[in-house]
Amino acid sequence: ENDNDDPGLINWDKFTFNSPEMQSLYRELDLAQQQQMEVTLTLWGAPDKHFLAGRNSGNWVVAPESNEEWSENFSALIQYLIKEKKYTCIKEITPVNEPDWSFLVNGKRASTAKYIEMCKALDRRFKKDGIRELVDFSLSDNSDGGIGTHKYLAACTRELADVADVFNSHTYIFGYETPNSTILDWERQNYELSKSAGKPHFVGEFGGNQCVGAARQKDINLYERGVLMVRIAINLLNAGASGVSYWSLIDQYYGKNDSYEGMQQLGLWKYVKNAYAQDTCYENMTVDYEVRPQYFAYSLLTRFIRPGAEVYPISTPDEFYAGTAIKNKDGKWVYIFANGTAQEKKIKIS
């Protein structure tokens, strides 16, 4: 329920900060704090039939009916987590996940202008409450670039240059058959659009294109998938991306009442063994959080690249063989190559 009828005034006594959902969030933030991770806090949208959704409907999350109420609640959350709970790991926020399809008004996809209005309202509220400098705004968060268009990002970079600290996009269209040049071209367009606004571009989600609905990928248990993920990441970084985020770290349920079919089985490692009791993979699992083969390839990338590193692209004569050189802030170099072909490749570095 709403705290009051005045979005300009936060009634802290009406907020529930000890709910099961908040306790779950605290556990994740505690781990991030302990492991010195940097967190981007994303709100998916206004839940259907929630007071923030108002009359908007059409999916399990929709656009907020009132930007002012939405901004008040988002501000209250950030104030509580950073000022009261003292979480220093929260560095960035993304106000809505993939708004190009999820930002629904009256059951229909809203225009980009509606999303832009919300972001500007959020920026004003954070400034009013004195917390704007505490977190960066990662905006656009679009999925439409992944289906061959950059229109959503283009509109956001035009209209939110003075609001965003970074722009980000998601993609799941690249696979074993995708040449390096295609991946490079996709991200270069994102990079140039963001650069025109004076901001970096981050790939906030990426994975392969062997999708089975939103919760499965056919090649998830193959080592070769890890090599593909590295090849995609190399090309994204070579094209100018400020960073990449594989989706997702671990198998997970989005909702506690979801069916087994709804479990997101996209992780670098699995969830607890009992969660797979009805699956054919159950008998072969020996431990909780079993690591998938793709982890061993992808972690060769993530274990050696640190935030703030410089990227120096390495050209190769093969469209399915990618390389890059990374100079970390401590001056140490890392050379990364991903061979997506069936033939061995010789590497000579001089």
Each language-model region and where it sits:
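Substrate-binding cleft and catalytic face of glycoside hydrolase catalytic domains
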Residues: 1-164, 168-174
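Short, glycine/acidic-rich beta->alpha junctions
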Residues: 20-24, 117-118, 182-186, 224-229
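Conserved, mostly hydrophobic/aromatic
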Residues: 77, 93, 167, 236, ...
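Active-site flanking residues adjacent to catalytic metal/cofactor-binding acidic residues
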Residues: 97, 204, 338
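Glycoside hydrolase catalytic-domain groove-lining segments
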Residues: 162-215
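Aromatic/acidic polysaccharide-binding cleft in carbohydrate-active enzymes
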Residues: 203, 207-299, 312-320
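Carbohydrate-binding surface patches
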Residues: 316-350
